[in-house]
From Swiss-Prot:
A Pfam match: Ion_trans
Name of the protein in question: Cyclic nucleotide-gated channel alpha-4
Chain spans, region C-linker: 274-350
Positions in the Cytoplasmic compartment: 1-38, 92-116, 160-166, 274-575
Entry remark concerning the domains of this protein: The C-terminal coiled-coil domain mediates trimerization of CNGA subunits.
SUPFAM superfamilies: cAMP-binding domain-like, Voltage-gated potassium channels
Claim: Endoplasmic reticulum is one of the keywords in the record: no
Origin species: Rattus norvegicus (Rat)
Residues flagged as site, Central gate: F258
Reactions catalysed, as given in the entry: Ca(2+)(in) = Ca(2+)(out); Na(+)(in) = Na(+)(out); K(+)(in) = K(+)(out); NH4(+)(in) = NH4(+)(out)
Source taxonomy: Eukaryota, Metazoa, Chordata, Craniata, Vertebrata
Signal peptide location: none
Location in the cell: Cell projection, Cilium membrane
């Protein structure tokens, strides 16, 4: 159907279906409602995976709670049916846009294998109860076909949870439990088929005291299966062919399961180490370097303490590398939500454009300083400014002991040194010693990054320079005369640059004109040489050459006037 046809159909729809659509909205496959529905479907699927097999292999369990099983069976069937309805109301992405047209959703769903599996899982095989009796739960094995829905729920949870590694381990343990559970059920069913107590391998005769209880039957079977699959204990030797086949199958399953478990655990551990390496610096390399270079123990202890502080307090120093795979705009939004409030406290950045602050936020570099470490010293060249995120810094004298002031969270320093303010008496050098009292977390903004951003915002640059001038005036650090001299020098330099630009433009124009004249002269000479060659060899000259030559040199043709002009110009030239 065309787009126009869709519009007409929507407009002609009566109010009743519109109201129905409100009650049955289209779900976003990445939304919360769809996620929680997937988690709801975990329960009926796990019920069928665990209980149905157990009921089929342990007759006492099936007979003792028949009514409860019927209630749970048809409750799970109802959820299966509702799940198909949810699938008919779950949108999908097409060219990045969520499709909410229910006709398109239904058409797409019924053409997938998922729809066929969902239908097969709801085939009413229970109708055979009428002929075979209600104690054959194996008729419900087709409910296992809904297992892909379980895997989808696990994948979504692993993506959303804050502890993905713990969830992976829990999921692996669940798989191990299901495998051992199924194996124990098959072991008990095989023992019943071969005869209880016929040899040491099968389940003991229920006539013995204690072995007739259902709980003992299941726990014994589960224990026996655990011994076989984990190969950690002695088990009775098989005696019959069926027992040998069962043991061989279990041993093969144990080998494959052991490889799977080891691979999964290795993957989890590797992911944990990779995450730590991405968030925190690798201290092992630094420790090895210090050992090879014979760094003194005191300095080595400080370095180790710094790494330990980062690890214990979850401090990150490489946010750029962590967020590098995000799209630029999304990375900017994350950085803005984390750091914009801190940057807004800086006086020279107040009332600046929001887009400017967003770009500056991406340039902030987190740094952590140890107790007693100098952030900057008096006289150092200032190439960056600092914003205190957490901790305390002291303005100290040259002796490093006398404190003039203490700077806390939210304060900043060094902002004047990264802005080129004319007349700044201190230039771009530090005017104080700043030392960290404890562990301090700072944000660093370099002069190069600020200059790069301000190149796109000249108006904001002028506003910042004006604010910097006001700050310097209050501090009596602004030389007005020097500022005027620098401004005059800058204006003179700009005037000279404009003059040079104008001269350069004139030279380029003259060069282009001369180049055009040179090309024209070369073309005329080429035509003349070719014409002389034809005349020298007394060949009949082509008409097009004569016409082209006449057009190129109207004063030097074959006419008498042309010959006279040529002779006047220099008769010996042709000779």
């Amino acid at each position: 159907m065309s787009q126009d046809g869709k519009v007409k159909t929507t407009e002609s729809t009566p109010p009743a279906p519109t109201k129905a659509r409100k009650w049955l909205p289209v779900l976003d496959p990445s939304g919360d409602y769809y996620y929680w529905w997937l988690n709801t479907m975990v329960f009926p699927i796990m019920y069928n995976l665990i209980i149905v097999v157990c009921r089929a292999c342990f007759p006492d369990l099936q007979h003792s709670y028949l009514v409860a099983w019927f209630v749970l069976d048809y409750t799970s069937d109802l959820l299966y049916l509702l799940d198909i309805g949810v699938r008919f109301h779950t949108g999908f992405l097409e060219q990045g846009i969520l499709v909410v047209d229910k006709g398109m959703i239904a058409s797409r769903y019924v053409r997938t294998w998922s729809f066929l599996l969902d239908l097969a899982s709801l085939v009413p095989t229970d109708a055979a109860y009428v002929q075979l009796g209600p104690h054959i739960p194996t008729l419900r094995l087709n409910r296992f076909l809904r297992v892909p829905r379980l895997f989808e729920a696990f994948d979504r949870t692993e993506t959303r949870t804050a502890y993905p590694n713990a969830f992976r381990i829990a999921k692996l343990m669940l798989y191990i439990f299901v495998v051992i559970h199924w194996n124990s059920c098959l072991y008990f069913a095989l023992s019943r088929y071969l005869g209880f107590g016929r040899d040491a391998w099968v389940y003991p005769d229920p006539a013995q005291p204690g072995f007739e209880r259902l709980r003992r039957q299941y726990l014994y079977s589960f224990y026996f299966s655990t011994l076989i699959l984990t190969t950690v204990g002695d088990t009775p030797l098989p005696d019959r062919e069926e027992e040998y086949l069962f043991m061989v199958g279990d041993f093969l399953l144990a080998v494959m399961g052991f490889a799977t478990i080891m691979g999964s655990m290795s993957s989890v551990i590797y992911n944990m180490n990779t995450a730590d390496a991405a968030f925190y610096p690798d201290h092992a390399l630094v420790k090895k370097y210090m050992k090879l270079q014979h760094v003194n123990k005191r300095l080595e202890r400080r370095v180790i303490d710094w790494y330990q502080h980062l690890q214990i307090n979850k401090k990150m120093t490489n946010e750029v590398a962590i967020l590098q795979h995000l799209p630029e705009r999304l990375r900017a939004e994350v950085a803005v939500s984390v750091h914009l409030s801190t940057l807004s406290r800086v006086q020279i950045f107040q009332n600046c454009e929001a887009s400017l602050l967003e770009e500056l936020v991406l340039k902030l570099q987190p740094q952590t300083y140890s107790p007693g470490e100098y952030v900057c010293r008096k006289g150092d060249i200032g190439r960056e400014m600092y914003i205190i995120r957490e901790g305390q810094l002291a303005v100290v004298a040259d002796d490093g002991v006398t404190q003039y002031a203490v700077l806390g969270a939210g304060l900043y320093f060094g902002e004047i040194s990264i802005i080129n303010i004319k007349g700044n008496m201190s230039g771009n050098r530090r005017t104080a010693n700043i030392k960290s009292l404890g562990y301090s977390d700072l944000f660093c903004l370099s002069k190069e990054d600020l200059r790069e951003v301000l190149s796109e915002y000249p108006q904001a640059q002028a506003v910042m320079e004006e604010k910097g001038r006001e700050i310097l005036l209050k501090m009596n650090k602004l030389d007005v005369n020097a500022e005027a001299a620098e401004i005059a020098l800058q204006e003179a330099t700009e005037s000279r640059l404009k003059g040079l630009d104008q001269q350069l433009d004139d030279l380029q124009t003259k060069f282009a004109r001369l180049l055009a004249e040179l090309e024209s002269s070369a073309l005329k000479i080429a035509y003349r040489i070719e014409r002389l060659e034809w005349q020298t060899r007394e060949w009949p000259m082509p008409e097009d050459m004569g016409e082209a030559d006449d057009e190129a040199e109207p004063g030097e043709g074959t006419s008498k006037d042309g010959e006279g002009k040529a002779g006047q110009a220099g008769p010996s030239g042709i000779e």
